[in-house]
């Protein structure tokens, strides 16, 4: 037991920012980007060494906020500034998944993101009463890119399936026919048919033996100086601007507005320090016009 405790406390790096999913639902990539970076680097290196037939395809990665408050205010990934140990990587990657690579095209990427955007309720701009931003669709299904190479907007005033706007790759509208390799996990690659058909296993080009968590640990060991600039600031998506008559609200960890501010989310405000749920959460609002 002591050996196990010692192992999980093994230092692997250092972070200069608080890596959390507290505001992942409104655009903070702080705990997701390093997972995507690790998955992308791992898959790209394998393809280069072993799969020459895919060497010309861009390799991208998606991941999701696995802990996003379902069980209350403490149910978020939240890694403090300072030393990073193996147990922190387990917080950054909760599940015992393995890395899988799938081949898709630009049209598939849009449809994949449309499915992920079920995370949000449809917001009525004319409604003057409070509207809840987050739906019952689980946070662990809210796949996102976290790279400057891919940019898109999510229009929450639109119905499910029509929310992804201005999707670009390298600054140009994504080519629906262009092929890409996406690094993800075995669960999404084989059980994700509700996202796109190719996520029934048929799109998989490499089923790696390695756990996503171990890939993250290895990546941090190789790149131990983790920083907001390099590992926590690449916002691929934002909400499409919308003027809403009433407040658009969501819950997150108690009194954590400083985390949103540190992530540059100037459109988030604290509405109530105690949202009355008894779960240790606060109520926040997001101004979609900003």
Please report, for each region that a protein language model flagged, where it lies by residue.
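Catalytic centers of hydrolytic enzymes
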Residues: 1-290
């Amino acid at each position: 037991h002591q050996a196990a405790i010692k192992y999980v406390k093994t230092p692997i790096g250092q972070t200069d920012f608080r890596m959390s999913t507290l505001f992942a639902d409104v655009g903070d990539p702080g705990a997701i980007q390093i997972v995507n970076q690790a998955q992308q680097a791992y898959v790209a290196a394998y393809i280069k060494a072993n799969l020459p037939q895919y060497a010309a395809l861009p390799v991208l990665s998606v991941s999701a906020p696995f802990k996003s408050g379902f069980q209350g205010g403490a149910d978020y990934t939240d890694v403090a500034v300072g030393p990073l140990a193996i147990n922190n990587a387990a917080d950054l990657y909760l599940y015992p998944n393995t890395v899988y690579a799938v081949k898709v095209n630009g049209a598939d990427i849009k449809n994949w993101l449309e499915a992920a955007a079920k995370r949000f309720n449809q917001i009525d701009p004319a409604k003057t009463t409070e509207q809840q931003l987050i739906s019952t669709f689980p946070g662990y299904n809210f796949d996102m890119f976290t790279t400057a190479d891919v940019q898109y907007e999510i229009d929450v005033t639109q119905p499910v399936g029509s929310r992804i706007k201005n999707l670009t790759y390298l600054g140009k509208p994504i080519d629906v026919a262009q092929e890409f390799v996406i690094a993800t996990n075995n669960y999404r690659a084989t059980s994700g048919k509700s996202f796109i058909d190719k996520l029934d296993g048929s799109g998989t080009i490499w089923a790696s033996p390695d756990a996503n968590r171990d890939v993250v640990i290895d990546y941090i060991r190789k790149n131990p100086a983790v920083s907001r600039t390099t590992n926590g600031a690449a916002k691929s998506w934002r909400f499409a601007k919308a003027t809403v008559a009433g407040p658009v609200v969501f819950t997150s960890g108690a009194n954590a507005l400083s985390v949103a501010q540190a992530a540059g989310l100037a459109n988030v405000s604290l509405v109530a320090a105690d949202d009355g749920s008894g779960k240790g959460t606060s109520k926040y609002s997001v101004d979609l016009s900003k």
